[in-house]
């Protein structure tokens, strides 16, 4: 195939263009990436109402150096992190919280299985409105664009918009 060609963030999200994210992550410090993941609730417990909840794993430089040694982790390790694979471990409830944070621009209570008043809030990632809009545009394009990886998921119901992102579990 000819590949995706040159794409912007919206197209990269819609077409699930790994190369775009490989190039992007090489411009971000691993510890900065770790901080961003943590702001969205990954790498820490959600305190959902189930025993023995795992916090998952979002690797930082310290973790990678301890695991692989000073020069042991490769660019490939970093590239895998860009697409949510490799050393990343997340729980289904963390993914649910993440989607809720995106859907509400960070104004989402944390998820619980038991109904209670005054639910604690998720961490609120501070993003500029144009960043939220880029995310929404990419998630919508994954469903409605001709090259979107989720294009067959649109129910085409008036007044009902589906947003989504396909992915590959490791």
Predicted regions and their residues:
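Beta-lactam-recognizing serine transpeptidase/beta-lactamase-like catalytic domain environment
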Residues: 1-170
């Amino acid at each position: 195939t000819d590949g995706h060609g040159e794409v912007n963030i919206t197209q990269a999200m819609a077409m699930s263009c790994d190369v775009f994210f490989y190039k992007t992550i090489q411009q971000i410090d691993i510890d900065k990436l770790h901080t961003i993941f943590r702001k969205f609730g990954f790498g820490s417990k959600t305190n959902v109402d189930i025993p023995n909840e795992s916090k998952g794993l979002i690797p930082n430089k310290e973790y990678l150096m301890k695991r692989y040694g000073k020069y042991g982790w490769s660019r490939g390790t970093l590239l895998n992190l860009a697409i949510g694979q490799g050393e990343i471990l997340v729980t289904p409830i963390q993914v649910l919280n993440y989607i809720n944070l995106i859907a509400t621009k960070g104004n989402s209570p944390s998820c619980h299985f038991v109904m209670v008043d005054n639910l604690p809030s998720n961490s609120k990632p501070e993003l500029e409105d144009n960043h939220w809009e880029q995310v929404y545009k990419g998630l919508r394009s994954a469903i409605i664009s001709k090259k979107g990886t989720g294009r067959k998921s649109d129910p085409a119901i008036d007044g009902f918009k589906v947003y989504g992102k396909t992915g590959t579990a490791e």
